[in-house]
Structure formats: structure tokens, C-alpha cells
Design a protein with these regions (language model features):
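Solvent-exposed, polar/charged alpha-helical surfaces in well-ordered, non-transmembrane soluble domains
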Residues: 6, 14-15, 34, 38, ...
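Pocket-lining segment of extracytoplasmic ligand-binding domains
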Residues: 49, 125, 130-220
């Protein structure tokens, strides 16, 4: 894990696993959902929007704590006519990692919060993040959901502007990324799972309470790219180390929204989904 999902690796770097009598091995891969679900790894931090639907489809993952808010926003060309999500009606919006994936789900929720139907009022299409600006300039798309880290320099240079964000007031009290574990691992090793969660949350608290020092560590270790100014600003905005109450409230709310919006289709009982997806161990 790296960037905003670096809590588990930061916990190892700071010696928190060792303090708890645990040893840890970092694994670099392309899919934390697959790795967690098949028990190749025990813990990872990642987007709730990426993992919630697979959980309802039988993937053996459960959330054990919250990591942070924020992460991604809707961006348009700075000199475009688009100022709000309402201006995007009838337009194409890129969800870079694909239809049905986390960008798609986040965009659906952002639009829905403004009374816009993601399936009828706009067209969500996949354009890779690095091609989105060119696609906007060519008129192929009007907007894109991008990570705030990716968009930072282009906003500063006056190329892009943000018109809707997970840092806006109505989403700033909602989790973006969560700590997740293999479900069977948690059931069979509750004591170890608790120790792991404590170590990761201790790392999140360190990152929140010591943003300058933590950002330097993240950059020195290669877990944060870009410049220090950008990283300190973004890391401060994420509010690392969310309470179980905060995370549980987000899950209850988002599960109901996912069902209503048709993002979750294999189950329709919110309480049953919550039981699968939420296993606070602290």
C-alpha cells in the first residue's frame, strides 16, 4: 500500500507490528480485492467504493476500521462553462477505472446527492486518467472523476477546476478508504486481527497528528509521489484515523444508497450487507 492507503506499511515502518509481537510482510500487487478475497494478504487499506459490491457478490472481505475521507473529486476544464454538476446533464463523464468500479460508484453518489441520475441524466464512460484532459479539450468528455493528487498540479496551473468533491460538506463526514481484512482470517484469528487493526490505526493517528513528519517519511520511502507542498496539503485534508462510529455510520448510509441506486444488485437487505461488510475489531 502507498499514498493515502499507506497505513499498513507505515505501521510496519514505525515498528507498531513488532510492538504487538507480530511480524509483517508487505506484498505489492495490482488488486487488493483479489488478494484479500483469496487470503493472499490479511490486511489492506483501500476504497470502500471498490470493495463493497464484491463483498455482496461473495468475495471474502470485511471492513475492520476506517482510514480517511476525501481522495477523489469531479474535475472539468478551468475555462469550461461547467460550474456545477447540474451543468453536466446530457454530458459524458469519465470514470477512469471503469464501469461498475470505484470511480463509477463514487461518481454515482456525488451526482445523486445533487439530484442527478447517473444512468439517465449523464453518460458515464471510461477514459484513462492520463487521457482525460485531452479528451476534455477534444470535447469527448465534459468531466472526469480524478484523484486529488493527480489533479493537484493541473488545478494549480489553471488547467482544471473542481466542481464536486468528497471533501465537500455533505461527504466530508463520510469514509472514503477503509481498513479491510480477509473475512475468514478475522473469524479464525480475532486476537491477531485486533492487534493488526490497533497497529494500523496507531499509524493513522501518527499520520494525522504529525502531518509534516509523516509526509516526509512517506516521500522518503517512495509511498508519496510529487512535491512536499502538495502532499502535506492533501495528507492534512484526509483526516487519517476515523472512529468506528464514523465508519459504521458511513457504511449504513452508503449501503442504503448503493441498493437504491442499483449499484448493489445481488442483495437487497441493508442489515445483512452490513453484517457481511462491517466487523469492527477494536
Amino acid at each position: 500500500s502507498d499514498g493515502c492507503t499507506s497505513g499498513p506499511t507505515m505501521a510496519d515502518h514505525l515498528g507498531y507490528y513488532a510492538e504487538a509481537g507480530l511480524t509483517a510482510e508487505g506484498v505489492k500487487g495490482s488488486s487488493d480485492v483479489e488478494a484479500l478475497g483469496t487470503n493472499q494478504v490479511d490486511v489492506a487499506t483501500g476504497m470502500m467504493a471498490k470493495m463493497l459490491v464484491p463483498i455482496t457478490n461473495g468475495v471474502d472481505i470485511t471492513f475492520t476500521g476506517g482510514a480517511h475521507i476525501g481522495c477523489k473529486s469531479l474535475y472539468v476544464l478551468a475555462d469550461s462553462e461547467y460550474a456545477t454538476t447540474a451543468d453536466l446533464k446530457g454530458q459524458k463523464i469519465s470514470v477512469p477505472n471503469g464501469i461498475g468500479k470505484s470511480d463509477y460508484n463514487i461518481t454515482a453518489l456525488l451526482l445523486d446527492a445533487d439530484g442527478i441520475n447517473y444512468s439517465t441524466d449523464v453518460e458515464l464512460v471510461q477514459v484513462s486518467a492520463d487521457a482525460c484532459v485531452t479528451a476534455m479539450e477534444n470535447g469527448e468528455i465534459a468531466a472526469a472523476l480524478l484523484s486529488d493528487t493527480f489533479a493537484y498540479a493541473m488545478v494549480k496551473d489553471g488547467k482544471l477546476k473542481c466542481i464536486r468533491s468528497q471533501l465537500d460538506t455533505d461527504f466530508a463526514d463520510r469514509v472514503c478508504c477503509v481498513m479491510a481484512m480477509n473475512g475468514t482470517f478475522v473469524k479464525e484469528n480475532p486476537t491477531i486481527a485486533k492487534k493488526v487493526a490497533q497497529a494500523v490505526q496507531k499509524a493513522h493517528s501518527y499520520m494525522r497528528d504529525n502531518p509534516e513528519e509523516a509526509t516526509k517519511v512517506l516521500m522518503d520511502m517512495g509511498w508519496n509521489g510529487g512535491n512536499y507542498e502538495m502532499n502535506i496539503m492533501i495528507n492534512n485534508s484526509l483526516q487519517f484515523g476515523l472512529s468506528d462510529e464514523f465508519t459504521g455510520d458511513t457504511l449504513k448510509d452508503f449501503i442504503e444508497r448503493y441498493i437504491r441506486l442499483g449499484l448493489i444488485t445481488s442483495m437487497d437487505n441493508a442489515d445483512e450487507i452490513l453484517d457481511l461488510a462491517w466487523t469492527p475489531v477494536l
